[in-house]
Design a protein with these regions (language model features):
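Conserved short alpha-helical segments that host acidic/polar catalytic motifs at enzyme active sites
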Residues: 1-154
C-alpha cells in the first residue's frame, strides 16, 4: 500500500470540506487524530481553532461577520474519562453529555441528524477514540441526508 501525504492530498483539491482522521502513528505507538475544515460560505470561512480547558473549539475570526453561529461555533475535540471525542459540529457536546450520563456514542448520535444548512445538508461526522491498557479502539459515524426532496437521512 502506498503511503500518501494527507496535506498534499487535501491541497490538491479545490474544496475538501470537513474531515476527521483517526489512526496510529507510523511506528504504531501513538494514537493520531486530526480534524480539518474548509468553508463554502463566508460564514463558514470565518472561523479559527482555539484551545481552552483541554478542548478544541471553533470560534469566529471576526465576530461582527457571524451569520449563523450554531453552525460554526462548537467544541470540535473534547475528552471525557478515557475517551477523546472529535466531530465536525455541536454533536461533540451531545456525545460528551451522553457519556457523562453513562450512555453511549451510538445513543448520542441517534438523537442527531445532518446539519440544517440547505441546500448542502452538511453531513455530521463524528469519531471517538477509547484508550485502554496502552492501546485504543475507535468508532466513527456519518449522519447524512439520503434524499434532499424528502429529507430522509441515513
Amino acid at each position: 500500500m502506498e503511503i500518501r501525504n494527507l496535506a498534499n492530498e487535501l491541497n490538491s483539491l479545490p474544496y475538501h470540506g470537513r474531515g476527521i482522521v483517526i489512526g496510529k502513528s507510523e511506528d504504531g505507538k501513538n494514537a493520531v487524530t486530526a480534524y480539518f475544515i474548509m468553508g463554502r460560505s463566508a460564514n463558514s470561512r470565518n472561523r479559527v481553532f482555539t484551545e481552552r480547558d483541554g478542548a478544541v473549539f471553533t470560534e469566529p475570526f471576526d465576530a461582527s461577520k457571524v451569520e449563523e453561529p450554531s453552525l460554526i461555533i462548537y467544541a470540535a475535540i473534547r475528552e471525557y474519562e478515557n475517551n477523546l471525542i472529535v466531530t465536525n459540529g455541536d454533536q461533540t457536546d451531545t456525545v460528551y453529555d451522553f457519556l457523562k450520563e453513562g450512555r453511549t456514542f451510538e445513543e448520542a448520535l441517534e438523537t442527531r441528524e445532518f446539519e440544517p444548512d440547505a441546500p448542502n445538508f452538511t453531513p455530521r461526522i463524528s469519531g471517538m477514540l477509547t484508550f485502554d491498557e496502552g492501546d485504543f479502539t475507535y468508532k466513527m459515524s456519518i449522519l447524512k441526508i439520503k434524499d434532499p426532496q424528502t429529507e430522509n437521512w441515513i
